[in-house]
Swiss-Prot record:
Protein keywords: Acyltransferase, Cytoplasm, Transferase
Domain of life according to the entry: Bacteria
Family recorded in the similarity comment: Belongs to the phosphate acetyltransferase and butyryltransferase family.
Known EC number: 2.3.1.8
Protein name: Phosphate acetyltransferase
Entry GO MF terms: phosphate acetyltransferase activity
Transmembrane segments: none
Annotated PANTHER family: PHOSPHATE ACETYLTRANSFERASE
Amino acid sequence: MSAELFENWLLKRARAEHSHIVLPEGDDDRILMAAHQLLDQDICDITILGDPVKIKERATELGLHLNTAYLVNPLTDPRLEEFAEQFAELRKSKSVTIDEAREIMKDISYFGTMMVHNGDADGMVSGAANTTAHTIKPSFQIIKTVPEASVVSSIFLMVLRGRLWAFGDCAVNPNPTAEQLGEIAVVSAKTAAQFGIDPRVAILSYSTGNSGGGSDVDRAIDALAEARRLNPELCVDGPLQFDAAVDPGVARKKMPDSDVAGQANVFIFPDLEAGNIGYKTAQRTGHALAVGPILQGLNKPVNDLSRGATVPDIVNTVAITAIQAGGRS
């Protein structure tokens, strides 16, 4: 599958779901341009947060048509008080007062997340102008995780040389435990399946099978056991070096009896450092299309953008979020 075909497939899937996505960063031109494209192609309904007058003026300057977008100013929206009351209740164990909650709800990330929590939007995409922490912290506090997830994690969908792969976790967890890695493997496989991947999961390491030793290898072995405990039907193996995971010739030599080695398509990196380096190496030197990070484990979809995101990146991430939202309804 080429990058172009995959992007077209994403948009077609998202259009079929026709979800409602909130974009909090209405003062960013890239967000407005992406919204224009999404609305023009009837991919999803869009709410943009910010000053409606300024958004309309900037859209006119850029030659954009946002007539069908919902433009919402959190500072004057009548839901602000209701959202503040809900947030104060959600965070009462942290002694958040109603006055503090009112101030917090003026923040675009919190207001957008509360819209998703209340069903006023099906998902949120942010991060073009804000940090990852600013984007996803509200979701931890408001939307929270599904019962079967102890952590929020992420995958990137990677289109490389005609192959569709998933890399996880490349954006959220710095140093996951063996148990968390096993859970991330299971959840990543489930997310990958939403996007047409028949998951064969490789838990990556610097060692393949029992060829090496050390605490990191032991962690990969324990992660494999946890993944199999959580989902006995999952096609997963490890520890695997990357070449053994993807190259059938290497796999025959190093792991000849593995159902995953040589044909893996979901790759679980040992930590955030390795995962982030891995996906960016594939993106920058292998010219892979990287779509994500796609957050997983939350009750409702919220996805983060890189501050270097292009307009096509934003369009793809909104499409991903729309598909995630549709899959839950």
